[in-house]
């Protein structure tokens, strides 16, 4: 049996025109957010730690995340790529360490909501935002989403 070809894409700064996670860190946490982004990008800290820092801030809400997402577009050529994939029975899949609420929002606004998405989840519990990592690894908590495991 022939295996189906899959194209896997990240979301932040790959499918989208900016890294919305970085923008949220800075918008919500200010200078501390800039430090976290810098430490994250230099791999001094992992996504799980960064997510915990943003989630413990009272300002984080789905509405704030959606508001920030309004400024985000998608890269040129994505619709053409999706058309090519559909014509040739190739799966285009989004695998991200970002949050469902902004990924879903940006994809929906750009008529891409039918793409399969594997990402972290934001949930409101007792009035506080919690970030869940359904695709994390039990062996490592550096990344919120262990993309290697998702690709298996």
Where in the sequence are the language-model features?
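Generic cytosolic/nucleocytoplasmic N-terminal low-complexity/intrinsically disordered segments
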Residues: 1-2, 146
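Alpha-helical substrate-recognition element adjacent to the catalytic core
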Residues: 2-121, 125-126
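Conserved acidic, metal-coordinating active-site core of Asp-based
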Residues: 110, 115, 119-152
């Amino acid at each position: 049996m022939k295996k189906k070809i899959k194209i896997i894409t990240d979301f932040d700064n790959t499918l989208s025109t900016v890294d919305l996670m970085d923008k949220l860190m800075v918008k919500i946490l200010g200078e501390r957010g800039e430090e976290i982004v810098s430490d994250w990008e230099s791999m001094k800290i992992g996504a799980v730690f960064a997510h915990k820092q943003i989630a413990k801030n009272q300002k984080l809400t789905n509405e704030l995340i959606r508001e920030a997402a309004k400024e985000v577009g998608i890269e040129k050529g994505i619709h053409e790529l999706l058309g090519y994939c559909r014509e040739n029975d190739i799966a285009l899949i989004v695998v991200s360490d970002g949050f469902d609420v902004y990924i879903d929002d940006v994809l929906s606004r750009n008529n891409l909501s039918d793409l399969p998405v594997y990402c972290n989840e934001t949930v409101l519990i007792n009035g506080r935002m919690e970030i869940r990592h359904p695709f994390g690894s039990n062996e490592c908590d550096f990344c919120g989403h262990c993309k290697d495991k998702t690709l298996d």
